[in-house]
């Protein structure tokens, strides 16, 4: 069984942390992954930096720009991940835009993911129809779970279709804005979470965008299996460096 599916069966609320590969320094990728697992994170999303990250807010955009300046590329990320499965056991997901994957070669990319122990992909600009028609068989051949995003504007019909072609979890975006721009969840967002819950999907949902602390983590996981934090974690690194990523995780999970 894929590590993502195994993790989703665990009887607790899940925390996923996103960070940008090659940030703040080129060599930080492996250290951050290892430290996050030690601190009790359930999933890790490794951001593949891209020059035009449309869905990302300013914090993640800046980290992506810096990572590219540091020399991070798709090939170099796979080099860094070569021995990672000797050091960590939790699910690892690469999150990135489709252009670098196309440039690398989609099948070559999937093959490298399998070789390095990547469990899934989140590709915000890969439409579900295109995935279903052209890439689903290929991704599944290499054991990869492709995670799709839904927003408050996604219709019930579309959500059901996404659910039908998914075999991991559904990324439930808390708003239609960019990452890192929300503070707490209003009535409209809660109504959207409830609407998705009422659809009784086969794939669990994990909430992303606007999760930054224990309060927002708890709010999100009232309606979902887990929550994803990106911008707030990168801000923590900006302010505190990479020497104590565990302190951030402990605050979110309210561990003492």
From Swiss-Prot:
Disulfide bonds: none annotated. Pathway: Amino-acid biosynthesis; L-tryptophan biosynthesis; L-tryptophan from chorismate: step 5/5. CDD domains: Tryptophan_synthase_alpha (cd04724). The keyword Secreted does not apply. Its EC number is 4.2.1.20. Pfam families: Trp_syntA. The active site is at 45 (proton acceptor), 56 (proton acceptor). InterPro entries: Aldolase_TIM, RibuloseP-bd_barrel, Trp_synthase_alpha_AS, Trp_synthase_suA. One of its GO terms (cellular component) is cytosol. Keywords: Amino-acid biosynthesis, Aromatic amino acid biosynthesis, Lyase, Tryptophan biosynthesis. GO terms for molecular function: tryptophan synthase activity. It catalyses: (1S,2R)-1-C-(indol-3-yl)glycerol 3-phosphate + L-serine = D-glyceraldehyde 3-phosphate + L-tryptophan + H2O. The alpha subunit is responsible for the aldol cleavage of indoleglycerol phosphate to indole and glyceraldehyde 3-phosphate. NCBIfam families: trpA. Tetramer of two alpha and two beta chains. Belongs to the TrpA family. This is Tryptophan synthase alpha chain. It comes from Christiangramia forsetii (strain DSM 17595 / CGMCC 1.15422 / KT0803). The gene is trpA.
């Amino acid at each position: 069984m894929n590590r993502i599916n195994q993790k989703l069966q665990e009887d607790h609320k899940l925390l996923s942390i996103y960070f940008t590969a090659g940030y703040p320094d080129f060599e930080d990728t492996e250290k951050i992954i290892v430290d996050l697992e030690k601190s009790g994170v359930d999933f890790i999303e490794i951001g593949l930096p891209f020059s035009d990250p449309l869905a990302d807010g300013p914090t993640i955009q800046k980290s992506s720009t810096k990572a590219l300046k540091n020399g991070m590329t798709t090939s170099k990320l796979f080099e860094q991940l070569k021995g990672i499965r000797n050091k960590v056991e939790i699910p690892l997901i690469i999150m990135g835009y489709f252009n670098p994957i196309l440039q690398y070669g989609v099948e070559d990319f999937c093959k490298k993911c399998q070789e390095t122990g990547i469990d899934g992909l989140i590709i915000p600009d890969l439409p579900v129809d295109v995935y279903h028609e052209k890439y689903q068989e290929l991704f599944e051949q290499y054991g990869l779970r492709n995670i799709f995003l839904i927003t408050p504007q996604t219709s019930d019909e579309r959500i059901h279709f996404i659910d039908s072609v998914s075999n991991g979890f559904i990324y439930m975006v808390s708003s239609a804005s960019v990452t890192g721009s929300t503070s707490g969840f209003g009535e409209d967002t809660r109504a959207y979470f409830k609407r998705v819950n009422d659809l009784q999907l086969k794939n669990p949902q994990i909430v992303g965008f606007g999760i930054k602390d224990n309060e927002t983590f708890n709010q999100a996981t009232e309606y979902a299996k887990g929550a994803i934090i990106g911008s707030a974690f990168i801000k923590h690194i900006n302010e505190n460096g990479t020497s104590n990523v565990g302190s951030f995780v402990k605050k979110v999970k309210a561990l003492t």
